[in-house]
Amino acid sequence: MKKIRRVLALVLVVSSLLAVASVGVLADAIPGQRLAVFDDIGQMNSSTFTDVSSKTWCYSGVKTAYNKGIMLGYTDKTFRPNNNVSWAEAITIAARIHAAYNDNLIAEPSQNEAWFMTYYRYCSERGMLPSATPAVGKLSQSINRYNLAYLFAKTIDDQDMPKICDYAIGDLSSIPGYYKASVEKLYAAGVMIGVDSSYRFCGTSTTSRGQIATVISR
């Protein structure tokens, strides 16, 4: 039962990460419900981040995502909610989800290396990284939804994402072949339903840290 609940929670987290443009459809969700099966590993308070206060639009989302260890801040005590999600951040989140799903441990970072390198190695060793992944020195660049889909389609096994949905992808014909299977897998599993009433994927779009924190915590 615990395994099933964890799988469902992880599917919902992935769903949220890839559906940030459809926040309205989750307006009635209970804050923190999606991540309730995960233990808190942190405790955000008023002094945790200098740029997120109780009046910030994404405060509750940031607090839940931080407390669950899904998203953390920067060394200068900022969260930077309006920044686009970077490759390094997406890879880190994917590694954490995959490790939680598989009961794996992620190695401690080596001394004097970039903070994301242990997560990069974790994903690289498991064949999770898309071919478009930039060089390590450029992982601070923003990641688009095509590459998010590819990356997060690798986090949960196919048998735990059965086909339960028949939504037609509004812009399927424009999705590059390399990403099509990942997008179709996530649509079929009901993990994502697109960003508008036509269920378009809009793969070249990016998303912000505040948006992701808000939706994954619902």
State each model region's role.
Residues 209-211, 215-216:
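Non-catalytic cell-wall polysaccharide-engagement segments
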Residues 63-68:
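Mature N-terminal segment immediately following signal peptide/propeptide cleavage
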Residues 183-186:
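Extracellular C-type lectin-like domains
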Residues 69, 190:
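Phosphate/pyrophosphate-binding loop motifs in nucleotide- or prenyl diphosphate-using proteins
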Residues 4-12, 18-59, 72-146, 154-181, ...:
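Feature responds to low-complexity, polar/acidic, surface-exposed segments characteristic
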